[in-house]
């Protein structure tokens, strides 16, 4: 099974992602649930995942900062997807420049 990390500061969003999607039937398992980028980096220091799905706007470290840190410091080669309500093209450009696989509004 492929390991997935969910990163979002909204508990209802995290809960919804875990319950609504049938991860197992797609060959995925939720390996970690983090409420901000710093928590995600802490988890990734000792663990590997195959896919990171992250919100953009979060306290302490946002999703774009998380993506940039992971790529710059070569912390993980996991596919990275941003799931957000921000439709600002600058966010999209910044995400793509840093290797974001997908940007879901």
What positions do the PLM features span?
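Short hydrophobic/Thr-rich beta-strand motif most characteristic of the beta2 strand and flanking loop
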Residues: 25-35, 43, 92
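Active-site residues of response regulator receiver
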Residues: 8, 55
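Acidic, metal-coordinating helix/loop segments flanking the phosphotransfer/catalytic sites
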Residues: 18, 33-51
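Short amphipathic alpha-helix used as the core "switch/output" element in two-component signaling
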Residues: 42, 64-75
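Two-component/phosphorelay signaling modules centered on CheY-like receiver
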Residues: 11-32
């Amino acid at each position: 099974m492929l390991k997935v990390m969910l990163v979002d500061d909204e508990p209802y969003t995290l809960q919804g992602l875990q319950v609504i999607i049938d991860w197992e039937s797609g060959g995925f398992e939720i390996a970690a649930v983090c409420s901000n980028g710093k928590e995600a980096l802490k988890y990734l220091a000792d663990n590997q995942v195959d896919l990171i799905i992250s919100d953009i706007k979060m306290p302490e470290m946002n999703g774009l900062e998380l993506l940039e840190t992971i790529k710059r410091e070569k912390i993980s080669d996991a596919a990275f997807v941003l799931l957000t309500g921000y439709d600002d093209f600058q966010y999209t450009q910044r995400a793509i420049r840093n290797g974001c696989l997908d940007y879901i509004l």
